[in-house]
Amino acid sequence: MLCAVYKSSRKADTYLFVNKRDCFDDVPQALLDMFGVPQLVMVFPIVKRESLGIADINKVRAALEEKGFYLQIPPPQVNLLAEHRENLGIKD
């Protein structure tokens, strides 16, 4: 099975995986509206991959089979200042 990966034109480091290139039939319209114009990054055979960047390959495969798409959002940014203040015992 091939998988097409698109990056968002509106949200940084946000990617949409779909089963077929340029086929967004299974993706909710509200998600597409927030995602912006999908920009193709790559197409690859997902069955031959053992890992992906930050996404769990098993979750991606399962989502593609069940929902027809997988949305990868960036991990939350760590607030180093807040963490440092907490370690020092400083409260707001």
Curated annotation (Swiss-Prot):
The record's annotation in Gene3D superfamilies points to: YcgL domain (3.10.510.20)
Q: Which SUPFAM superfamilies match?
A: YcgL-like (SSF160191)
Which parts of the sequence belong to the YcgL domain? 1-85
Q: Which InterPro entries match?
A: YcgL-like_sf (IPR038068), YcgL_dom (IPR027354)
PANTHER family (UniProt xref): PROTEIN YCGL
Q: What is this protein called?
A: YcgL domain-containing protein SO_2575
- Organism annotation: Shewanella oneidensis (strain ATCC 700550 / JCM 31522 / CIP 106686 / LMG 19005 / NCIMB 14063 / MR-1)
